[in-house]
Amino acid sequence: MMKRQIFLTLLAFALPALLFIMNATISSRDERSCDISWSYRNAKFAIEGTAFNEYWKTILDSLSLSGDCHSKISPKLAPIFVSAFSGNHLSEATHMLSSFVSYFAEREDKRTLIVYDIGLTRQNRRQLNHYKIHYGVLVRRFNFTKYPDYFRNLLEYRWKPVIIAEVLKEYPAIWWLDSSAIFANKSVNIQEAEKWTSERSVQVTLFENSSHSIFAATHPDMFRYFPVPVNAAKTLTMWSANHMLFYATDSVRRAVLRWWVLCALERRCMAPRDAALSCSFQSDRMNFYADCHRYDQSAINLLMALASNFGHNSYAYPYQKPIVIVRRA
């Protein structure tokens, strides 16, 4: 009887500690849990896309995109700006850089600009020194060796979603600018767009209407991965990917970035066989396929359509005044 009483007394003291340790272990494991589905499921129409290769998990891990892991970045930091270009786009890129400097010159709200080198020569990089030294522009080289060889085909734009994902590991929000994007005028208040985006359920905003449907400029094979019904794709306008705003929220990582990066990694998702950039539009730019493909832009539009339950008002910026305009050299 005495031994039994001693045992029960010890158990009464030990059990709470044991439960605490078990709960802490389970909690720790749950926080690290990064289970991932490898095929996109369209819940509205009960359609499942072609599965991506699980080989890409290591890269997803490196970009914090493997599952439901929570972002540790402070949301209080203002969005920074990110761009990327090769030497053949340096001329238009210098206009973009100058417009960025001019726009923020008289503003108290200073912002960081990171430029990714995706094919600059030594001389090209020297030409950027002016912006690095005087305006704090940061220049990074994109590490192509971490990714499949076909990333080096710059016209397939696989590098764009990966660069955006890389930077969103460090910063809570980013503006993406193509090298051809320049600020339209100094009176535009980007903070209005940032506030609007931060209030969305999936905090990604596209800004420029392309005046044709997603269907018209998306290779049919991409729909195998992101199962949007053809009739829906014909009614949805494609929005340009030349300037976009992203917040590093869990919903953005799960619903958009993870799949966008997977598409970039999967050879025939981002660039289906026989895909071509040049379009042959008919007078009806919504209901007829223009025999072309917009690569990263097609993918982000499909993903945003799916994430918003096919309501572009959730991600297409509603105000008419342009934030940037595109001027290609």
Predicted regions and their residues:
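Glycosyltransferase catalytic domains, chiefly GT-A lineage
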Residues: 2-329
